[in-house]
């Protein structure tokens, strides 16, 4: 699904399609956000090719966090020379907690080198500027990506349409999740692309979604 001229959204539609939403940031430098599990990746690869992108020619994989359902398949593209990025606390979590987390979900822990640490601040993809925000709560190394020119927020598993990310996994924190959500609510956003579920589109809908989260979810995050 084309969101803007250079942003494409690939929703999680079924377990044979993928297991999380993936986002392509196109342009001079091509980055795929959250590749998901490796088993269903051929379906996502086919969609990318329809949009004119060879997955093996991507420049960067950006991981919003290091839970297997968003990150696992990154290792396959890395073997083709695609660089892999995540927050340094995400890498630490991957090394220390990743094997246990993967075993608990019946998977093998990915063995992969992280080429780029996503620290808070500006990330340049060619002429495109992305602001990286460290947004812990769902996991210690979670990040959100904000594209100010397009007013697009890529929220990972921080917020969804009428929902928030789980905070009961190892390293999760309801209090940190709440702080991170409040930070993101202050941005000038017209489109939210979450890690699961549908797009939140339109400034009014984005603001209403944050209001709903404050009313119904914040009391549980104390």
Predicted regions and their residues:
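Active-site HxH/HxHxD metal-binding segment of metal-dependent hydrolases
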Residues: 39-123, 212-215, 219
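Short polar/acidic secondary-structure junctions
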Residues: 14-15, 123, 136-137
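Conserved beta-strand hairpin/beta-sheet module of binuclear metal-dependent hydrolase folds
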Residues: 1-51, 144-156
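Short, charged, surface-exposed secondary-structure boundary motifs
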Residues: 19, 94-98, 163
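Short Pro/Gly-enriched beta-strand edge/turn motifs at strand-loop
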Residues: 3-8, 101-105, 127-128
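Metallo-beta-lactamase
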Residues: 30, 37-39, 100, 129-221
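Short beta-strand or tight-loop elements
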Residues: 5-6, 114, 121, 126-128, ...
